[in-house]
């Protein structure tokens, strides 16, 4: 599998529950680069780049979330790899 870019919006109880840190830990473990960012509407935007296989595994973690989170929806699309990140950050 080649390189790809994931763009996802995660809905539910995902702010103030450690969701971004949880996402960051799993992204780094899977070798992904990008970011997780709280949005004003209560969702979390996630952009991650890396190998497609790792991105597919990562999607499972987005659905699961940390213990205090309650994920109700993950809207995502795979895009062309851009190689613009050097780490995985949270905002």
Swiss-Prot record:
Disulfide bonds: none annotated. It comes from the Archaea. The keyword Zinc does not apply. The keyword Hydrolase applies. It comes from Metallosphaera sedula (strain ATCC 51363 / DSM 5348 / JCM 9185 / NBRC 15509 / TH2). Belongs to the acylphosphatase family. This is Acylphosphatase. Gene3D superfamilies: 3.30.70.100. It catalyses: an acyl phosphate + H2O = a carboxylate + phosphate + H(+). Signal peptide: none annotated. Residues 5-91 form the Acylphosphatase-like domain. Keywords: Hydrolase. The active site is at 20, 38. One of its GO terms (molecular function) is acylphosphatase activity. InterPro entries: Acylphosphatase (IPR020456), Acylphosphatase-like_dom (IPR001792), Acylphosphatase-like_dom_sf (IPR036046), Acylphosphatase_CS (IPR017968). It is an enzyme of class 3 (hydrolase). Its EC number is 3.6.1.7.
């Amino acid at each position: 599998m080649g390189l790809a870019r994931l763009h996802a919006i995660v809905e539910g109880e995902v702010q103030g529950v450690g969701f971004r840190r949880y996402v960051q830990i799993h992204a780094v473990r899977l070798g992904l680069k990008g970011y997780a960012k709280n949005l004003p509407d209560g969702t979390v935007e996630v952009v991650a780049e890396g190998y497609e296989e790792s991105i597919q595994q990562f999607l499972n973690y987005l659905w699961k979330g940390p213990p205090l989170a309650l994920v109700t929806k993950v809207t995502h699309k795979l895009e062309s790899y851009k190689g613009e990140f050097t780490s995985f950050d949270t905002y």
